[in-house]
A protein has these predicted regions:
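Conserved beta-strand-loop-alpha-helix junction that forms the acyl-donor binding cleft
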Residues: 117-127, 144-149
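Conserved N-terminal entry element of GNAT/NAT acetyltransferase domains
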Residues: 1-15
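Conserved acetyl-CoA-binding loop-helix of GNAT-fold acetyltransferases
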Residues: 87, 93-106, 129-133
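Conserved GNAT acetyl-CoA-binding A-motif
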Residues: 108-119
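Acetyl-CoA-dependent GNAT
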Residues: 11-14, 22-77, 83, 88, ...
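Conserved functional loop/turn residues at catalytic and ligand-binding sites
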Residues: 16, 84-86, 90-91, 95, ...
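Conserved active-site alpha-helix within GNAT-family acetyltransferase domains
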Residues: 98, 122-141
């Protein structure tokens, strides 16, 4: 993968939330996830928000949070959840996701967080590849059910 040396990653600021919501929310560049709503975007923890930029333009974001005793992994205690990673289409393939993940890994290591989680769709093979390249390993699968009435 080519990497662009002009891509920088910085901590998120309150003024970044509007851009995150615009690009990720309804009507943005990303198909809206029915399990995420606007109120959830407003609760993004700023200490876990990372912004990637290229020549002053917004290239993508990553946000994460710290937690304790996840319900889905009974033996775990302290952990970090990489909640969302988004790279604008025109910046994909240039190492933006890799840089965001590298910064995330440095931040959680500095805080002494021993265990990291990320979840993605089973059809999102690009994300699976990115996470596996970063050292994440699959450990749990979930199934969503639906019923028409």
């Amino acid at each position: 993968m080519a990497t662009d040396p002009g891509v920088t990653v910085r901590p998120g600021r309150i003024e970044d939330l509007a851009e995150v919501a615009r690009l990720y929310g309804p009507g943005g560049e990303t198909p809206w996830d029915p399990f995420i709503d606007a109120a959830r975007l407003e609760r993004i923890p700023l200490d876990g928000l990372l912004i990637a930029e290229k020549d002053g333009s917004y290239a993508g974001f990553l946000y994460w949070f710290e937690g304790r005793k996840p319900w889905f992994d009974k033996g775990a205690d302290q952990y970090a959840q990489l909640e969302e990673l988004h790279v604008r289409p025109e910046f994909q393939g240039w190492g933006v996701a890799q840089r965001l993940i590298e910064r995330f890994l440095r931040e959680v290591a500095a805080r002494g967080i021993p265990l990291l989680y990320v979840a993605t769709d089973e059809t999102n093979t690009a994300a699976q590849h990115i996470y596996q390249e970063a050292g994440f390993q699959p450990f749990l699968r979930t199934i969503h059910y639906r019923k028409y009435t």
